[in-house]
């Protein structure tokens, strides 16, 4: 099983889900998962997979832990 954790505004976009556990015995594209959750790709700013930065087109595999953060802005 893989764990996907959403942060800040991404939680609301995903219907209030903060953490998901998915069966990833077959690798799944992060973009596919985001589409299923209703989270637009362009809203995801930082992706951390297994404690390392990753890209939006990464493959989620069994035992992965993925943290998703929205685009942050400020001044």
Could you tell me what each predicted segment is?
Residues 1-74:
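Ubiquitin-like/PB1-type beta-grasp interaction modules and other compact soluble beta-rich domains
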